[in-house]
Amino acid sequence: YPESIDWREKGAVTPVKNQNPCGSCWAFSTVATIEGINKIITGQLISLSEQELLDCEYRSHGCDGGYQTPSLQYVVDNGVHTEREYPYEKKQGRCRAKDKKGPKVYITGYKYVPANDEISLIQAIANQPVSVVTDSRGRGFQFYKGGIYEGPCGTNTDHAVTAVGYGKTYLLLKNSWGPNWGEKGYIRIKRASGRSKGTCGVYTSSFFPIKGYR
């Protein structure tokens, strides 16, 4: 795997989105990984619908939080519409997937990255954007302005984001708090730092979608 990678430079990352005030980070993280693999496989970068997951993926809890695996499974089973077709409303509503027209993006499966294993995660990110979790509760994270973040934070995670690259000393994470947060909506978080769970628990629960050629 390369020493560093930034999927933004490869055109596989849509502009930073904003989930607020809804607790829908899980949908944004999942969708960003699917936008990424879809671009890698098809050559097209298409902004996809978080709102569809919020409204239609019933195993998660809408604006009260959700999960990486059921949301990925939803897209395996149903596909996901584009952002344009099913735009974000900042709140959970009735599932309108059946009423929507236009193309959908599908994935064929998803895979779990071995937990608390830096090299496995780096190898995964070298291939595509990956859904990861962090502890975002601390003021340092909430009000992060730039640089390589080392904490303070715990490893009890509460927030899903998307790893879209790495360097020698950091992971590059796409957040869903709008472009005015952090480094234009991104955070660089310190790699390894002697904690097997990673800085802010970033190595504890990571998934990526698999997409065949369809």
Swiss-Prot record:
Task: Spell out the GO cellular component terms annotated for this protein, sorted alphabetically and separated by semicolons.
Answer: extracellular region
Subcellular location per UniProt equals:
Secreted
InterPro entries reported in the protein's UniProt record: Papain-like_cys_pep_sf, Pept_cys_AS, Pept_his_AS, Peptidase_C1A, Peptidase_C1A_C, Peptidase_C1A_papain-like
One Pfam family per UniProt? Peptidase_C1
Organism field: Jacaratia mexicana (Wild papaya)
Which PROSITE patterns does its entry note?
Answer: THIOL_PROTEASE_CYS, THIOL_PROTEASE_HIS
Q: Which residues form the active site?
A: 25, 159, 175
Give the domain of life: Eukaryota
The UniProt record lists the EC number as 3.4.22.-
Classification from the root reads:
Eukaryota, Viridiplantae, Streptophyta, Embryophyta, Tracheophyta
Q: Does Protease show up as a keyword for this record?
A: yes
For this chain, the annotated S-S bridges are: 22-63, 56-95, 153-200
Q: Which UniProt keywords apply?
A: Disulfide bond, Hydrolase, Protease, Secreted, Thiol protease
Q: What protein name applies here? A: Mexicain
Task: State which tissues express it.
Answer: Expressed in latex.
List, in alphabetical order, the Gene Ontology terms for molecular function in this entry: cysteine-type peptidase activity
Q: Give the record's GO biological process terms.
A: proteolysis
Q: Which family does it belong to?
A: Belongs to the peptidase C1 family.
EC class (word): hydrolase
Q: Where does E64 bind?
A: 25
Describe the task this protein carries out. Answer: Cysteine protease.
